[in-house]
């Protein structure tokens, strides 16, 4: 049923995930909110749907939980025809594989465990945040004072030892007691917090 709805030209498909999740995988026809934090998602989606209150809206997310909350919010805001992908991308990927169907979702499904992603199709739709090469491998910077989540290709990973910059590579190579000083330095931590990838 969702497959038919997603292909309907009168349907607005909304990705209810943060940009770092959707940049590695998404439904082809989806509108992607350009937000980095979950708290900003609902206001942004409401803004995106302004003037389309009578459209059919389909929501999707990783496992379905965020869509439950979002659909209640949107219905309360006057958008009455809201549906969601039951079980999220996880269930969708399982179902299409089981039934041998072509996936309308391309790329990886970002997951919140050590894997940081489950491949749904072989498509790579994102690029390395450092050099622009095709890549969909999320990493946490190995400099624990930074620890930013970013996408890195294998060449940049090798060149920077899993760090997001030369500065972080230098810090990550220090003895652990020296690294701890950076973690405790609030000025350094605040500076890293606002790192923006070229993708964003």
Model-based region annotation:
Residues 1-5:
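Conserved small/polar residues in nucleotide/adenosyl-binding loops
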Residues 8, 18-57, 65-200:
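Rhodanese-like catalytic fold shared by cysteine-dependent sulfurtransferases
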Residues 12-16:
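Short hydrophobic beta-strand that contains or immediately precedes a catalytic carboxylate
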